[in-house]
């Protein structure tokens, strides 16, 4: 019997650090980032079917969804007209800086490659990923990675220790393009300390990462949505929170917390304030098959 459906768990990411290092002639920004998989995931089911590509993801259904575009690119490369149905159970919030759309696209590529008996190598899948978006290549690989270029060039780092996290997201999101435009007005290019990150991660202690947390987009996104600054400031005051940072272009802020019990207590405070809150942790790998 031919397997006609593959299920994937598509994991979100946070940026433990993000520096904008320059801007290319085509307008894209070059960066250095320490990217990290976390335990919040979307559930993706990809099924061989009839009638072209269909992508079901609530209000994010249809051809604009990155998973749909991933399927288009995959099939086009094979010269195939096979019908594909993609069903996405969405748990990763959008416009949060957590790479939800990218995780879904990466999972769609991985699921399709399995369904079609692996016609593409890992390098070829990475090539598709680079065409789809800056974070898709990371989501194919997952874990803890040093990203450069526009985010598509990856180099492994020591696995982060298991870190307890609280994620808090305001109702309003931040548009990534708007965040970069705001950065262009006032931001300055910078670089991260690769050797410092290697050493901190290799120590196996969450506390070692705190001095290195950094995000060049944070001031820009805080200007667009000042609530982010308030969330970060309040989170830092709470018992057990070692450090906090906005992820990516926001609007989600993560707090690194000493224990899971403390993370749950902090989360309860923010739920009472009617915020979107998740208690999670770092992951050693990214997307996995269901």
From Swiss-Prot:
HAMAP family: IspE. ATP binds at residues 93-103. It comes from Desulfitobacterium hafniense (strain DSM 10664 / DCB-2). It catalyses: 4-CDP-2-C-methyl-D-erythritol + ATP = 4-CDP-2-C-methyl-D-erythritol 2-phosphate + ADP + H(+). Coiled coil: none annotated. The keyword Nucleotide-binding applies. Keywords: ATP-binding, Isoprene biosynthesis, Kinase, Nucleotide-binding, Transferase. Its EC number is 2.7.1.148. Catalyzes the phosphorylation of the position 2 hydroxy group of 4-diphosphocytidyl-2C-methyl-D-erythritol. The active site is at residues 13, 135. The keyword Kinase applies. Pathway: Isoprenoid biosynthesis; isopentenyl diphosphate biosynthesis via DXP pathway; isopentenyl diphosphate from 1-deoxy-D-xylulose 5-phosphate: step 3/6. GO terms for biological process: isopentenyl diphosphate biosynthetic process, methylerythritol 4-phosphate pathway; terpenoid biosynthetic process. This is 4-diphosphocytidyl-2-C-methyl-D-erythritol kinase. The gene is ispE. It is an enzyme of class 2 (transferase). GO terms for molecular function: 4-(cytidine 5'-diphospho)-2-C-methyl-D-erythritol kinase activity; ATP binding. Belongs to the GHMP kinase family. IspE subfamily.
């Amino acid at each position: 019997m031919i397997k006609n459906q593959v299920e994937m768990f598509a994991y979100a990411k946070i940026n433990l650090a993000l520096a904008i290092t320059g801007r290319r002639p085509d307008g894209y920004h070059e960066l250095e980032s320490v990217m990290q998989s976390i335990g919040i995931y979307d559930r993706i089911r990809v099924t061989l079917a009839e009638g072209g590509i269909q992508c079901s993801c609530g209000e994010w259904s249809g051809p604009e969804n990155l998973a749909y575009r991933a399927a288009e690119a995959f099939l086009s490369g094979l010269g195939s007209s096979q019908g594909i149905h993609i069903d996405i159970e969405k748990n990763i919030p959008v416009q949060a800086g957590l790479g939800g759309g990218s995780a879904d696209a990466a999972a769609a590529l991985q699921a399709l490659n399995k369904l079609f008996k692996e016609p593409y190598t890992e390098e070829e899948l990475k090539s598709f990923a680079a065409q789809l978006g800056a974070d898709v290549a990371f989501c194919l690989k997952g874990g803890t990675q040093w990203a450069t270029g526009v985010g598509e060039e990856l180099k492994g780092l020591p696995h982060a220790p298991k870190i307890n996290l609280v994620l808090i997201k305001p109702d309003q999101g931040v548009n990534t393009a708007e965040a970069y435009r705001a950065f262009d007005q006032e931001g300055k290019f910078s670089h991260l300390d690769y050797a410092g990150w290697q050493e901190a991660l290799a120590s196996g202690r969450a506390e070692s990462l705190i001095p290195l947390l950094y995000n060049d987009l944070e001031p820009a996104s805080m200007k667009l949505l000042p609530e982010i600054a308030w969330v970060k400031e309040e989170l830092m005051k709470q018992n057990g929170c070692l450090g906090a940072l906005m992820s990516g272009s926001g609007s989600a802020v993560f707090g690194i917390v000493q224990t899971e019990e403390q993370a749950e207590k902090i989360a309860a405070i923010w739920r009472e304030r009617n915020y979107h809150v998740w208690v999670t942790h770092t992951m050693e790998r990214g997307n996995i098959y269901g």
